[in-house]
Amino acid sequence: MIISTTHSIEGRQITAYLDIVSAESVQGVNVIRDMFAGMRDFFGGRSQTLERALKEARVQATDEIKERARALQADAVVGVDFEISMPAGKGGMVVVFATGTAVKLR
């Protein structure tokens, strides 16, 4: 399964646009362990806890759009876009939303 942020696959022709596929992944962030993330960011550090949560959420969302595209018998998902949200007041959650178009290729 080819996953691409571009709207075409070099060397391949899109023969059918099947459907929009999307997925979301919500990851909890350990607020107590990472309550100093804001200070680290302020002083130029990096929050490994938050980076891990974001990476895991992105991987899960990508895997889910692959599964949904396979169910449509797609060869690829093009135009993939990721949106990241950290809802305020939700106790340290990271939400990644992925969307793209499932296509058939020649």
Curated annotation (Swiss-Prot):
Q: Which InterPro entries match?
A: UPF0145_dom_sf, UPF0145_YbjQ-like
Pfam families, alphabetically? YbjQ_1 (PF01906)
What residue range is the signal peptide? none
Q: Which family does it belong to?
A: Belongs to the UPF0145 family.
Task: Read off the PANTHER family from this record.
Answer: UPF0145 PROTEIN YBJQ (PTHR34068:SF1)
Q: What is this protein called?
A: UPF0145 protein Pfl01_1745
Give the taxonomic lineage as stored in the record.
Bacteria, Pseudomonadati, Pseudomonadota, Gammaproteobacteria, Pseudomonadales
